[in-house]
Amino acid sequence: MNIEQSIPRRDALKSVGAVGALTLAGVTIAPAAEPLKKPLRIGVVSAAIKGKPQPRNGHIWHFAQGLHPVCDLDALKKHYSYGHSLFTNFLRNPKFNFDTLPFPDTRITHYYDADPTVAVPFTEVFPGVQVARSLDEMLKGVDAVWMGDASGLGEDHFDLVAPGLAKGLPTFCDKPIGGDVAGTRKILEFAKKHNAPLMSTSCWRYEFGMEAALRMRDSGEFGQLEHVSARLFSRYSLPGWMIYGQHPVWAVMTLMGAGVEAVIMIEYKDTCHAMITYPDRYPCHTWFGQPYEKFEYDRTDLYFKKKLHTFTPSIEGSFNYGYHYQMFRLIATFREMVLTRKEPVPHQEILEVTAIVHAAAKSLAEKSRLVKLAEVMG
């Protein structure tokens, strides 16, 4: 179905506005009706991939763009022609802004990359953004930090977020936060030491279907949630699991919570399956490499006692519209954290997601034995 056509659910969401839509979805958002006298100044930081920059880091260009009021679509076509259609049809289409985007009280003021030339195109596409020559320079003029990492390994995360955390600035640190369990714990403990609100998670946490799933779980209407199966459509490789395996694990963590006991993973060619076990809950499943008829990136199945609930990121058949929605919810939650200084994601969940990913890799390396999470937690 063409999202530009009449879509009942989309029209319903649009007709009630962002606040009404989010109320229907069972989530809350800090109101944006009365902009602050001084807009929140956001500094974006781009992580590297093994020391190499990410010139069109989608976790900044796509995810964070709603935090800035202005986008020059002509400049976008010049610098990012591949993404022009997504921006014009969805991300910067006033018909699909959830009566909220771009936020009236936020501005991206600086873009930092270890290679300053990489930041220049972003400043031309989003007028008003400056190239930060150093983190120290950027931190003098921002109220919060967004560190985006689309495909990196996380080994540079601490160095990129620590200066802002040391100043107590609310910070988003992308996955895979810190790279390994020790790196994740180091960032979490540093943030806590400096009383700096920290957010780290997967955008899967904010899919429209996930919000419905959480509402079903919390209502108790369909009985106990007995099993979650979270699937990633892309073909599997072990290096890919270390980065993108975070997503299905985050789906399980979002629905079932922390307290994981052990993990076992098996692979066959370009697919893998991992079982995540709890001492007091039913085991759950992740699948990296599910075949698909239509690419929608992922699918999650919830098995309640009385109901099976299945969802993908798509809304009314449109992946791009659903992708737009989950990014909106992600940055809306970040904005709310900046305003309230209340962390939206428990630190234990963040730590256990990293541990699960690494325990699964350890399981695979050791003939797919069951690996206790304690073995990798240190």
Regions found by a protein language model. Give the residues of each.
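A contiguous active-site-proximal alpha/beta segment in oxidoreductase catalytic domains
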Residues: 177-238
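C-terminal helical cap and adjacent loop that interface with cofactors, partners, or active-site loops
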Residues: 314-378
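Rossmann-like dinucleotide-binding domain that binds NAD(P)(H)
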Residues: 229-295, 348-355
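N-terminal export signals
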Residues: 4, 11-32
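NAD(P)-binding Rossmann-fold cofactor-contacting core
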Residues: 70-122
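C-terminal segment of N-terminal export signals and the immediately downstream linker at the start
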Residues: 27-46, 51
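Short acidic low-complexity segments
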Residues: 97-101, 130-141
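Beta-strand-loop-alpha-helix segment that lines the small-molecule cofactor/substrate pocket
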Residues: 142-145, 151-202
